[in-house]
From Swiss-Prot:
This is Ribosomal RNA large subunit methyltransferase K/L. The keyword rRNA processing applies. InterPro entries: 23SrRNA_methyltr_KL (IPR017244), DNA_methylase_N6_adenine_CS (IPR002052), RlmKL-like_Mtase (IPR000241), RlmKL-like_Mtase_CS (IPR053943), RlmL_1st (IPR054170), SAM-dep_methyl-trfase (IPR019614), SAM-dependent_MTases_sf (IPR029063), THUMP_dom (IPR004114). PROSITE patterns: THUMP (PS51165), UPF0020 (PS01261). The gene is rlmL. Coiled coil: none annotated.
């Protein structure tokens, strides 16, 4: 008998021990990400052919202490490789792990390859050739700290490749993981099984193969053990023939049925093709449909729903997933009372949206991604309680939901009267729900303020999930129109940095002016909502005047001035992107011509050198900036007098500067302004719109004129 290592994923060791025991192995012992055991050739052939959980089987030829490359080389040369395979065989070395001395797996693989080749050449035999793509044998090496395991892969490529799947959906499960999920679900193979988000059908096919007793390795064309000197082809043919007969008989005996539902017709066709190649197509019914509306099949008593819903790398990028899990959970309770469910996801927060209590839960990895599998018993429910399911969802966060309702009734009506289709609905009104929510027509932008360090991450995630669910429910908005961002304390121009490349813009209306916003690609959208009253006022002041807009951003103030009848406009910003955006905003409102100038420049430098004069100047500088493109830092509190000194030179005798900034507790240096011959009037309270009335320090705004 030889000693073997069955390789599997972390967390599946004990499940694999059970499987190997059923295959006739009596001494299986779990180790990290694997199981060790002894087996005859017949037993290992059977294990390779029948294991649904192992990714490979390795014949162990040596285990040794390995501190450095010399230990690795000497221990490898001590193996009599000539006894294992002929020199004509092509090899590749799969080296896994590093330690203090062997820091590179490629280097480790090279040392093992050199040692094996030297074993043959020292016996005056031809040297085996190395071929990554055409290898007959894979030499397997595991190195962890000072412990090394050296062996021969009995399989070759991973056992997850069953042969039935030539293409998959967007996020396919490995077949070995799918089999583990089926086994962990507690499914009784005599009961029907439904996957309402089946994708390419892997879960269903693996379950159907179990029910039909089809060996998962039957379709594999090449095995590593076939290249070994002790390979027994007749014995292997017998083991394989026996499995083939069992599979053909098994399909005919299966009485249970399998149901697959997916909302992508192309992927469903792939699933059907995969099932046909696996030999189980007659056992599975595939249907186009929505998981959130899935109906219970006939004769589904005591059946089980098993699925791997989408979960995304980051919860925040997929608010739609929260709505999906919420609706799916409600549908499970409405349609599948008395049945079981097993759901696999990387996100415990998304699983909580199902609003079901798990009977059991397991931790599994999908590749490197830690995941949860939760098993549920779905209680029988009375019909009238099911009909109320949707309205009960807002009770997850009742205080928050009620505040949203109250705000929308007040602010929504005001916005409609004012001719606004974008406004702030909620701004951390309740401390425990620390977000800002802005409405842009039929879209929501939820900005999460970074949670304090003393709030546990899991608690913050769960609360954010509740916020998104309640907002979708109360405001009746399509979950795909919800955008989530995390807002932290800004440094310099970080609020203008690009977050994505979706380029999904939309056109909004503000007091009759049309503007373009982008909810996806930047932290800010291209429009500061707190300045809507300021912009309207600029439009009212601009008739027949030469208008200057500094730190112009996307030029929304320029558009209001132009639409208000400005004789000319000059828009200055350092960003080429935002100036192009400003031009698009102007063109959208029919404001084109030479009287409208756009200048890409450092506003402070431009201001110091400018000679033209203006009747109306709007300047809304950053609180602080240290942009690499600026020659010096800027602090609005420190530098506002210098700013006014330069602005005074450009201001005509009867002109007005509208000066705004976002620094909390900003103090205007009235004495310095008076010395410059300027008057300043604080109009902050006049420019604060209703949707920002709870945040009176969102900005401060001043009218500055020459002294008479």
């Amino acid at each position: 008998m030889n000693q073997y290592l069955a390789v599997t994923s972390n967390g599946l060791e004990n499940l694999l021990v059970e499987e190997l025991t059923q295959l006739g192995i009596n001494d299986a012992k779990p180790v990290q990400a694997g199981v060790k055991f002894k087996a005859t050739n017949e037993q290992i052939y059977r294990c390779c052919l029948w294991s649904r959980l192992a990714s490979r089987f390795v014949r162990i030829v040596a285990e040794f202490k390995c501190q450095n490359d010399l230990d690795l080389y000497l221990s490898t040369t001590s193996v009599n490789w000539v006894n294992y395979f002929h020199s004509s065989k092509k090899l590749v070395v799969d080296f896994n792990g590093t330690n203090r001395e062997i820091r590179n797996s490629q280097y480790g693989a090279m040392k093992v390859k050199d040692a094996i080749v030297d074993c043959f050449t020292k016996k005056n035999l031809p040297r085996p050739s190395i071929s990554k793509d055409l290898a007959d044998l894979h030499i397997h090496v595991r190195l962890h700290k000072e412990n090394a395991l050296l062996g021969i892969d009995m399989v070759g490529s991973g056992l997850h490749a069953r042969g039935y799947r030539t293409e998959a959906g967007k996020a396919p499960l490995r077949e070995t993981l799918a089999a583990a999920i089926i086994l962990r679900s507690g499914w009784d193979a005599s009961k029907p099984l439904l996957d309402p988000m089946c994708g390419s059908g892997t879960l269903l096919i693996e379950a159907a193969m179990m029910a039909a007793n089809i060996a998962p390795g039957l379709q594999r064309k090449k095995w590593g053990f076939e290249a070994l000197e002790d390979f027994e082809p007749e014995l292997w043919a017998s083991v394989k023939s026996e499995a083939s007969v069992q599979g053909k008989r098994g399909v005919k005996k299966v009485e249970t049925h399998f149901y697959g539902v997916d909302n992508d017709n192309r992927v469903l066709q792939t699933a059907k093709d995969n099932a046909r190649r696996a030999g189980v197509e007659e056992l599975i019914s595939f249907t186009l449909g929505d998981a959130a509306k899935v109906k219970r099949p006939e004769n589904f008593a005591e059946g089980i729903v098993i699925c791997n819903p989408p979960y995304g790398e980051r919860l925040g990028t997929h608010p739609g997933l929260i709505a999906l899990y919420t609706a799916f959970g409600a549908q499970l309770k409405a349609e599948f009372g008395g049945c079981h469910a097993s759901i696999f996801s990387s996100s415990d927060e998304l699983l909580s949206c199902l609003r079901m209590r798990a009977d059991k839960q397991f931790k599994l990895n999908n590749g490197a991604l830690p995941c949860h599998q939760k098993n549920y018993t779905i209680a029988m429910r009375e019909q009238n309680s099911v009909s109320n399911e949707g309205t009960q969802e807002i009770l997850i966060a009742p205080d928050f939901a009620n505040r949203l309702k109250k705000n929308f009734n007040k602010i929504g009506k005001w916005a409609k009267r004012e001719g606004l289709d974008c406004f702030r609905l909620y701004d951390a009104d309740l401390p425990e729900y620390n977000v800002a929510i802005d409405v842009y027509q039929d879209h929501l932008m939820i900005q999460e303020y970074a949670a304090p360090k003393d709030i546990p991450e899991e608690k913050a995630k769960r609360r954010l999930t509740d916020i998104i669910r309640a907002a979708i429910q109360v405001l009746d908005v399509d979950a795909n129109n919800v955008v989530l961002k995390v807002r932290e304390r800004q440094k310099g121009t970080s609020q203008y940095e690009k977050l994505g490349q979706q380029a999904q813009t939309m056109q909004i209306t503000e007091y009759g002016v049309k503007l373009i916003v982008n909810l996806y690609d930047y932290l800010d959208t291209g429009l500061f909502l707190d300045h809507k009253i300021t912009r309207r006022r600029l439009g009212q002041m601009a008739q027949g005047k030469d208008f200057l807009n500094l730190f112009a951003y996307t030029g929304s103030a320029t558009v209001h001035a132009a639409c208000g009848g400005a004789k000319s406009t000059t828009t200055v910003d350092m960003s080429k992107t935002y100036l192009e955006w400003a031009k698009e905003n102007m063109q959208l409102n029919g404001q084109v011509g030479r009287q409208h100038q756009y200048v890409q420049a450092d506003c402070l430098q431009w201001l110091a050198n400018a000679q033209s004069q203006y009747d109306l100047i709007f300047i809304d500088p950053p609180t602080f900036s240290n942009s690499k493109r600026m020659e010096q830092t800027f602090d609005v509190q420190r530098d506002h007098v210098t700013l006014m000194t330069n602005l005074k030179r450009l201001l005509r005798p009867e002109g007005t500067i509208v000066f705004s900034n976002n620094k909390r507790h900003f103090k205007m240096d009235m004495e310095a302004l008076h010395a410059l011959g300027l008057n300043a009037q604080n109009i902050s309270h006049q420019t604060l719109p209703l949707d920002f009335e709870r945040n009176k320090q969102i900005h401060n705004c001043w009218l500055i004129t020459h002294q008479s």
